[in-house]
Amino acid sequence: MEAKDVQISPEVQDLINKVNDIYPGKVEVQFIGQLQAGYVRHDQAQQVQDGKNILIQVADLTAPNYTASHELLHLLMILSGFPQVFFSLTTGNDQLDEQLMIMGTELYDIVNHVVVVSEQRKHNLITPEIEDLYLKGVQATIKPEPTPVDNEMTLRTLTLLDALVFFGDGHADILKQFERDYPISLAAAQKLYALIMAKPVTSPFTFRRNVVKLFKAFDEQLEAWHLPALHNTEFTTLTSVVSKRQLNLQVRQMFELYHSDMHDKTTQRRAYVGFNRADNQNAFVLSAPKPSEDTPDYYTKIYDMTVEDLFKLLKMPYILR
């Protein structure tokens, strides 16, 4: 099959229409090339900004409508006011930054997938054939666990957690296969799955809460395996979900500024992270002032501002509860 042969299904066309009803520019789905890997994986499509327009580019034609719908639903969640992740900090090591961004985005996406997969199942976009292709995608991504375990436990746990979200309950045969091939990482993934499914995602607020929970629990698991933690609560900025009352609070009432060891990506100066006092999650990043402006007054002024004024100053998006 070639890209020109792909026909958009009515369900996917419906999603394209829904997205275009909200988005001020134009959103189009574009199928590219003729590659068919023989499995589905979430890296087979991407969103590309083209001026005011967004292109959903599907680069693998194994299951083009499923893959397009997945990406469209991610976009629909953002346009509907669900929190996003931002990466404003640098460790000074480009390779490490890249790894941390990939992992942080993956954890965030897994919580997204709780909603995305539910919507796909509602619209019959996940068939037994798609489930089979998804399982093949898991097997193409992670090898069975060796004894002793290797350095791919993080990837296995992420992949299996996402698979548990995708398959949901009632796939005993697949679970048995996972138990046989990945016993240690599956046990970890099941604990994390129970955590993010304990309370349903019913709003941007509950979505954000589950992302923060997963960031923290994933680090606890890595530390239990004596692996380096990802520190997404500091490295990854997550959109704040605030009430009107909270917007009028002083910054000091809702956030605590913390002098980070990392630097602001834009200015390359030491960074201050604004942590939400309720859950210790990075809500915004400030660049340290220039030496000439580095006075106690500088920080007092920031703490004295209202939350709304600070977000305006930083051009930081927020979501109203």
State the predicted function of each range.
Residues 68-77:
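Active-site His/Glu-centered metal-binding helix of metallohydrolases
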Residues 57-62, 288-291, 301-303:
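Secondary-structure transition/turn motif
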Residues 1-50, 61, 102-104, 123-125, ...:
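Auxiliary, metal-adjacent structural segments of Zn-dependent hydrolase domains
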Residues 52-68:
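Short pre-active-site segment immediately N-terminal to the catalytic Zn-binding motif
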Residues 293-321:
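Hydrophobic, glycine-enriched assembly/anchoring segments
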Residues 98, 104-166:
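Internal, well-ordered alpha/beta segment that forms a basic, Gly-enriched binding/recognition surface
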Residues 138-296:
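Pan-zinc metallopeptidase signature
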Residues 63, 77-112, 211:
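Post-HEXXH active-site segment of zinc metalloproteases
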